[in-house]
Amino acid sequence: MIEIGSLIRDSYGDIALVTDHWIHDQSGEYHTVVKWLSGRYVGETDALYTDNLEVIAC
C-alpha cells in the first residue's frame, strides 16, 4: 500500500500526490486515489491501480 502523502510517478512520467485509498464495492479491487500535479490531467483527482506507480518521495 502506498502511503497517503506520497509523491508518485505513473508509467507516462506524470506526477501526482496520493490523497486516499479506495476499494471498489463490487469487484473488491484496490485503488490509490491521487491528485495530478503534472501531465494532461493537472488538478484532477483519479483512482488508479498501483501496478504502474512508482513512489518518488514519502
How would you label these PLM feature ranges?
Residues 14-24:
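Short beta-strand-centered aromatic/proline hotspots
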Residues 26-28:
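Short acidic/glycine-enriched loop/turn segments that link adjacent beta-strands
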